[in-house]
């Protein structure tokens, strides 16, 4: 066994040309997509920095959980990038994960069928689905073992996109996918 330290989760901050930092609440984004200091109108550079109260760039996980749910926040943290690397918090990422989770819920509402996915298939979409599912199980298993959660989640998203194209879902495949996604 080995101990793994998670990388630091950072946040966006803003700095002037002279490299001094500006608290987030004193910054506005304008129509041109750039960031400006409200008081002076000076254009600022968006940088990645350690979260701090003085910069007011601290993300309160309770607020994120309230908005998107604990499952979305937890999955986003695993999806942000390699576990041991530092990475910036971006609420837009949670929104994307939350949408994917809603897509999984929508798929769960579809009717199940008893098609034998291990046998010979005629339907091209089912053949592709079976192939993608096999790739998903293989990749998620390997990536979970090596703590590469971000790439495991990415592969599950690929499978969810394929699964959403189906009118009904093979029961055995859905049952197995629920087991694969449940730790995440």
Task: Indicate where each model-derived feature is located.
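Helix-rich, typically C-terminal accessory recognition domains appended to large enzymatic cores
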Residues: 1, 62-184
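A structural signal for short, well-ordered beta-strand segments
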Residues: 3-5, 48
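Short, conserved secondary-structure transition motifs
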Residues: 5-15, 182
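Conserved phosphate-binding loops in nucleotide/dinucleotide-binding enzymes
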Residues: 15-70, 84-95
